[in-house]
Curated annotation (Swiss-Prot):
This is Large ribosomal subunit protein uL3. Transmembrane segments: none annotated. The keyword Ribosomal protein applies. NCBIfam families: L3_bact. Methylated by PrmB. Part of the 50S ribosomal subunit. Forms a cluster with proteins L14 and L19. PANTHER family: 50S RIBOSOMAL PROTEIN L3, LARGE RIBOSOMAL SUBUNIT PROTEIN UL3C. Pfam families: Ribosomal_L3. It comes from Aggregatibacter actinomycetemcomitans (Actinobacillus actinomycetemcomitans). GO terms for cellular component: cytosolic large ribosomal subunit.
Length: 121
């Protein structure tokens, strides 16, 4: 369909109703469990003086005596490949080389994205 070095315009999306957009999400650095995984916070009062935003218990008992792999904990948030599916194409402006979509496009302003016709539409 395409050859190496061929220029591709937004005209190819003229008859497409929905698209999938892939980009790199904004990096947030090292974040705790409340922001990263939407964990609930602990009591502000009632005897709690130090651990308002900590995870709480992360294991079971003497058996298994360890924390399972994949446990949701604090760590790096964002700066990863994200695909938003089935965004509606509002308008294709060929002369200004613009593709207008309705919805959240992943990544910072001005970052590169990959746009494909929607898989599930």
């Amino acid at each position: 369909e395409f050859t190496l070095g061929q220029e591709i315009n937004v005209d190819i999306f003229a008859d497409v109703k929905k698209v999938d957009v892939t980009g790199t999400s904004k990096g947030k650095g090292f974040q705790g469990g409340v922001k990263r995984w939407n964990f609930r916070t602990q009591d502000a009062t009632h005897g709690n003086s130090l651990s308002h935003r900590v995870l709480g218990s992360i294991g079971q008992n003497q058996t298994p005596g360890r924390v399972f792999k994949g446990k949701k904990m604090a760590g790096h948030l964002g700066n990863e490949r994200v695909t938003v599916q089935s965004l509606e194409v509002v308008r294709v402006d060929a002369e200004r080389k613009l593709l207008l979509v309705k919805g959240a496009v992943p990544g910072a302003t001005g970052s590169d994205v990959i746009v494909k016709p929607a898989v599930k539409a």
